[in-house]
């Protein structure tokens, strides 16, 4: 198990240092700002849809290694998924962090985001890990409730 924890730690560090998905998206359909007042983490998520599929995502902002890595890995996990699939993955991630689900079969859909499983043991870091996930959840829920297709557009 220690070996797996090491792999997860390496993945988190790699994403926090390299921020593969930290960029500006041209022609984003949606944009949402997330802020964690407890530690000052702040992100802006951008989303590009192709029909009902997440074509691309990106983020900008600043924060601790956990929030930055969680955002980057979330983007990798959700790209290419339908909005419905993304909502299911988001729900599972939040439940994992809050210790509401431990079903290994259910957690498999998280792909690399499962690396944050042990964050639930660090109460001060839970909000950091969840920031991007709550932000994208808010963005997708706003889109559903209004149906305008142009919520908080970044253009």
Question: Where are the predicted features?
Answer:
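Domain-level signature for proteins that mediate thiol-based redox and metal-cofactor handling
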Residues: 1-155
């Amino acid at each position: 198990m220690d070996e797996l924890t090491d792999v997860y730690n390496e993945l988190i560090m790699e994403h926090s240092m390299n921020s593969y998905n930290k960029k500006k998206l041209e022609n984003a359909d949606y944009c949402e700002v997330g802020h964690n007042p407890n530690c000052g983490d702040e992100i802006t998520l951008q989303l590009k849809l192709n029909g009902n599929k997440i074509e691309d995502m990106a983020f900008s902002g600043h924060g601790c290694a956990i929030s930055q890595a969680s955002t980057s890995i979330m983007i990798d996990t959700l790209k290419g998924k339908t909005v419905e699939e993304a909502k299911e993955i988001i729900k599972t991630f939040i439940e994992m962090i809050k210790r509401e689900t431990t079903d290994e079969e259910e957690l498999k859909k998280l792909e690399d985001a499962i690396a944050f499983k042990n964050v639930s043991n660090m109460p001060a870091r839970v909000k950091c890990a969840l920031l991007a996930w709550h932000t994208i959840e808010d963005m997708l829920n706003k889109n559903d409730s209004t149906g305008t297709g142009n919520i908080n557009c970044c253009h």
